[in-house]
Amino acid sequence: MKVTLFVTCLVDMFETNVGKATVEVLERLGCEIEFPEAQVCCGQPAYNSGHVEAAKEAMKHMIETFEDAEYIVTPSGSCATMFHEYPHVFKDDPKWAKRAQKVADKTYEFTQFIVDVLKVTDVGASLPGIATIHKSCHMTRLLGVKEAPGILLSSVKGLIVRELPNVQNCCGFGGTFSVKMTPISEQMVDEKVDSVMETGADYLIGADCGCLLNIGGRIERLGKEVKVMHIAEVLNSRS
């Protein structure tokens, strides 16, 4: 099975270890990974900021780059969601809408692909300790991926998963929201950190680097001892 990886901007620039873990997990599960170097941003930051035409240019480039893939997998629920929004963005342009739909139909978030396409629930990972899961807004509410991360983590040897209080609440990142609405964002992430600490977890695990960078940065500034990990890193662990 051939998988074309969309690594995302944040992974490429800040969390390359997440990209490596994603590839290693998928290869162990029998996937052949392709990485088109022509890939760029999915267009979400520009689109959400109102720069629609600039976003469309990036989206067209991404459609051209990925439309011949068998499966498109990304370690980000947010970016996967944006791919699924492409047909809506091009709804008034039949030619591009058709090409966008072709791409959207074969785009999956990392854990979604493992559980729903590969039909795997245990990747053979092990990580001793207590964890709690942050469920990102785009991944759960827009993409509809709610159970896959928990299913996979429940099979990680030695890992105890505790429910995060107020798990449905946003962490305050929201892309440019954290910059444009900083006081509100800070209050939201403080509440999220309080919820994490309430669980007594050793690890905070999530599937979106934006959320994890935001929460992890706050945890570090507050001097809390919780390790923040992307779920790909956890599933690649052999502790």
From Swiss-Prot:
Query: Would you kindly state one Gene Ontology biological process term found in this protein's UniProt entry?
Result: lactate metabolic process
Highest taxon above the source species: Bacteria
User: What GO terms are given for molecular function?
Assistant: oxidoreductase activity
A cellular component annotation (GO) from this entry: cytosol
Among InterPro entries, the record links this protein to:
Cys_rich_dom, LutA
Functionally, this protein is described as follows: Is involved in L-lactate degradation and allows cells to grow with lactate as the sole carbon source.
Instruction: Please state which protein family the record places this protein in.
Output: Belongs to the LutA/YkgE family.
Q: Spell out the PANTHER family in the cross-references.
A: LACTATE UTILIZATION PROTEIN A, UNCHARACTERIZED PROTEIN YKGE
Protein name per the record: Lactate utilization protein A 2
Q: To which species is this protein native?
A: Bacillus mycoides (strain KBAB4)
